[in-house]
Amino acid sequence: MSDYKSTLNLPETEFPMRGNLANREPAMLERWNKDKLYQQIRDSRIGRKPFILHDGPPYANGSIHIGHSVNKILKDIIIKSKTLAGFDAPYVPGWDCHGLPIELKVEQKVGKPGQKISAAEFREECRKYAAAQVDGQREDFIRLGVLGDWHKPYLTMDFATEANIVRSLAKVISNGHLQKGVKPVHWCTDCGSALAEAEVEYEDKTSPAIDVGFNVVDKPALLAKFGVAQYNHDIAMVIWTTTPWTLPANRALAIAADLEYVLVSFTKEDVTRAIVVADVLHEDCVKRFGAESFEVLGRIKGSELELTRFAHPFLDFDVPVILGDHVTTDAGTGVVHTAPGHGQDDFVVGQKYGLEVANPVGDNGVYKADTPFFAGQHVFKANDNVVALLKEKGALLNHVAYRHSYPHCWRHKTPIIFRATPQWFISMDNQGLRSTALSEIQNTQWIPDWGQSRIETMVANRPDWCISRQRTWGVPITLFVNKENEELHPNSVSLMERVANRIEQHGIQAWWDLDAAELLGDEAEQYRKVTDTLDVWYDSGSTFETVVAARPEFQGHGVDLYLEGSDQHRGWFMSSLMLSTAMHAKAPYKQVLTHGFTVDGKGRKMSKSIGNVIAPQEVTNKLGADILRLWVAATDYSGEMSVSDEILNRAADSYRRIRNTGRFLLANLNGFEPEADMVAVADMVALDRWMVRRAAKVQSEIIAAYEQYNFHLVTHKLMQFCSVELGSFYLDIIKDRQYTAKRESHARRSCQSALFHIAEAMVRWIAPVLSFTADEIWQLLPGKREAYVFTQEWYEGLESITLESDLADSHWELLLSVRNEVNKELEQARRDKVLGGSLEATVTLYADTELAAKVAVLGDELRFVLLTSDAKVLPIDAAPESAVATELAGLKVLVAKTEAAKCERCWHHREDVGSVEAHPSLCGRCVTNIEGEGEARAFA
């Protein structure tokens, strides 16, 4: 055999079988950086149609987690696939840099501002801390193979961005959307600040649930309403609440106008009294209150009780009955304790009735000094004391511990309160912001489509947006208000532009350093500077304006796509929609795509306490970024995304199949020069032309899947193509021709030309997902080419040509089915020790007339398709009993061991081995391939 080895075309490549990604990828990243790859991509797309994916900024605090990785990889896949589609698709990553979490970290290091350190120094420390966090996260994102403008990202703390945030607020003001008011807002007593909707998490909490009686002031008038002539016992309207601490702020009792209310007399332990509650709940109520007997004395509509007055249970005033749409009969009594300073619904209904917005609670959650009974007590600790006082006053009808979902601070994980404070709001309804936003939601494509109804519900029900915070590290609300009437300076918009110019030069500290007289002159004495800062959701929500509209690479195009986790419907998607609608009366995006959260293999949330956290840094260090990228792409992101070591190892197995396919392609293109050796698709062997045609079809399906953001479909199509059509059919069949045909022969060059086209196409298919591997393959492909696959477009060399003489695609698919059935019998013969390998076999196909004609058309080349040394086709009627019926209708198969001699060069067993005296160990075909013109192939 050694004499003939040099006559074979053995595969050879520098592309290693093992990826060794964890070690090889960092060196590739260094080359990408040194070659300024991102800039090369930008230069290659000058003048092309833009596609703008705007990066939602992660918070500049802590290491990136697996959810961050999913998000950035999905964005990178889209950017790279859009670039391949010919778009100019810049990617500018960003970071959210202001806000409380950074303040808390800096406080741990240097103390609170105004104590050991000045506010100005504190802000500078916050800036340094955020910058260091950005640096750490940036390195981790780059390690994932994400290409972008990493050297010039956007930061919400960039001076220019801070200035643009101020300018954007000026637009909101000039369009009439800003208002000041005392309203109840989510308030964290640990933060000492208002919270945005998106900063509130709901957790279970046990609270005291109490039923409290408010005694009627004018008993005869109430009895008359119910048509009762006389009643000699106390009468109370009863509320049910889980926040006893809010009772000092009670200013009304709310009921539903259309509900029936009853006057019920009941006796408990020889004490008789009457209560007013909703009719549908009265039996539950008297049972809950331990009644031994009860009687309904009268029944009227809620609307008839409006403005009836009842005495506060422990404060020296009485409160009215008011009508509210928010009153339900899901639980309680059908009467709602109303404290306008401690609840959104209470506030809204209170405004209609001109109720006082009482707020007896300070920033720290402690009752103010002038609060009767509870001054100096923290509200949550005061709950028990409120209950005790109610009991003492005879107003407590029931008291139980109640487990329920309650809002908590996202940062401190502690319960929060609703608290009325003077704040700045973007009004949802004053200038029609809500209706415009709802209309714009309809003009946006939501992926998955359930995102639309989700955000519609949120917008329809959301309160005014409280955009002010009482913090140190944030973009200031750069307003001057009149000291006497709290009205904005009439020139606020132009003054804000002057302040923005200063911030652009010196950062937000310029506002705190500013003496009002520098801008207001003699008017300075009449105005005070606002010291509040903006909600950080305003910072990130305005980036369509402060970043996209401001940076030249976006060409003023506007944003095509926002892509974030499903929690951002109430976060970034919402704040961006509100601000874009407030500024421009249109949505900031054309498409919004959401992905699910990452969970472990059992569907559980990632948790350090459970020990199921998968850190992306560990994955890249162990398996490589391409494995992580393949897992992301192969997972349906529309739901929860399961990840575990086992799942990642499965992704690594899939990766090996793709890598092995790439290696086969490269190894068999050894010595192929496209310019000199290419066979036109029309001139190829039929099987090769069919394979190019199949690749063209797969490419169109893969491109369509990329366009629809169906990346799991991309990986499925890719794996199917590599494993089935290439791996177990085409590549198996062509090995013989590739290795044994004459090196320069048409038969071999045809096959190599097909492999070249497939490799050129496939390297592009995988580039958005397996970026490192695609680059590795690209560097080793033959022919002249640009430095990187990432500057290319989808391959156009896959000509879908069908000649008259060609077998139809369905014909090849039938042959593939026949081969699968033959393989089953060959495998059985191997298990039965009849054969060693398939080339020891001779196969007879007993087929019905139609099938026989389709199989026999290949003639002697049928054996190459079946990977046997001989293959015959006979009528099915001639099949002996030993022939095996297959799952393919009209086909029986008989496998036997050939008695022909084995050719030492091609390993086929042929009758003509030794027929040429000079080559006694070779078959006639191999002699032709060594000394003659080389064999000709028509089909395979």
Curated annotation (Swiss-Prot):
Residues annotated as transmembrane: none
Entry binding sites for L-isoleucyl-5'-AMP: E564
Entry superkingdom: Bacteria
Keyword check for Repeat: no
Enzyme Commission numbers on file: 6.1.1.5
Subunit-structure text: Monomer.
Entry domain remark: IleRS has two distinct active sites: one for aminoacylation and one for editing. The misactivated valine is translocated from the active site to the editing site, which sterically excludes the correctly activated isoleucine. The single editing site contains two valyl binding pockets, one specific for each substrate (Val-AMP or Val-tRNA(Ile)).
Full protein name: Isoleucine--tRNA ligase
